[in-house]
């Protein structure tokens, strides 16, 4: 586990305590996104019941990365536990779930049927990644060409690794979504693939 912590601290995603500068970032409070790519659009995701901001969807022309931040205990990690819960949930929806070792350690590759607007279904593939940090877990779900195109995969992974987390000091139960805040200005919704 120590090697994973050192690797994360060197390669990202980063804890705010590990970075010396927060210039040129889009500040969502607990998640700070360096302004890396003009072709990257950002959409905020709100919790349906509470309307609080809980996730960000980052989209290139051909791929999407959705990121969520979860609280974790001070002296332990939660990604393994989250993987088990996520696997059970997805399998209960008849998804095919494969646990693999990838760029971020243990990951899930998922194939599942999702409904289309016309009532038919389509096979969607999703890659779930997660990185434990000090008192936090950053989870990402990747769809689109980044699942098969190495250049696109590298770009999406670079975006995920560039995120800076400012978890704050508020006590939260383990695996609780850490709420985000809107930055000043407008955030354009991602363009729909054609």
Which residue ranges define each predicted feature?
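Conserved beta-strand segments of the P-loop GTPase G domain that flank and frequently precede/overlap
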Residues: 68-70, 111, 140-143
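Generic detector of bulky aromatic hydrophobic side chains
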Residues: 79-80, 135-142, 177
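N-terminal targeting sequences that direct proteins away from the cytosol to non-cytosolic compartments
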Residues: 1-55, 59, 63, 71, ...
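Signature of long, low-cysteine stretches enriched in small and polar/charged residues
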Residues: 85-132, 185
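Short glycine/proline-enriched loop/turn "hinge" motifs that connect secondary-structure elements
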Residues: 57-59, 128-135
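Coil-to-beta-strand transition motifs
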Residues: 62-65, 133-139
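Short, solvent-exposed recognition patches
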Residues: 69, 73-95
């Amino acid at each position: 586990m120590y090697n994973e912590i050192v690797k994360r601290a060197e390669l990202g995603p980063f804890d705010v305590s590990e970075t010396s500068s927060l210039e040129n970032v889009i500040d969502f409070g607990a998640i700070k996104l360096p302004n890396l790519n003009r072709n990257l659009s950002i959409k905020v995701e709100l919790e349906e019941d509470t309307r609080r901001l809980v996730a960000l969807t980052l989209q290139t022309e051909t791929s999407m990365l959705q990121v969520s931040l979860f609280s974790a205990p001070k002296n332990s990690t939660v990604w393994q536990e989250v993987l088990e819960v996520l696997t059970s949930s997805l399998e209960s929806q008849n998804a095919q779930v494969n646990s693999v070792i990838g760029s971020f350690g243990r990951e899930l590759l998922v194939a599942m049927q999702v409904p289309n607007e016309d009532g038919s279904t389509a096979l969607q593939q999703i890659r779930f990644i997660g990185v434990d940090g000090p008192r936090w877990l950053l989870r990402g779900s990747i769809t689109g060409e980044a699942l098969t195109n190495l250049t696109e995969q590298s770009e999406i992974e670079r975006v995920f690794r560039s995120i800076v987390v400012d978890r704050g000091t508020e006590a939260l139960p383990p695996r609780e979504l850490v709420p985000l805040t809107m930055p000043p200005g407008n955030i354009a919704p991602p363009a729909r693939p054609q």
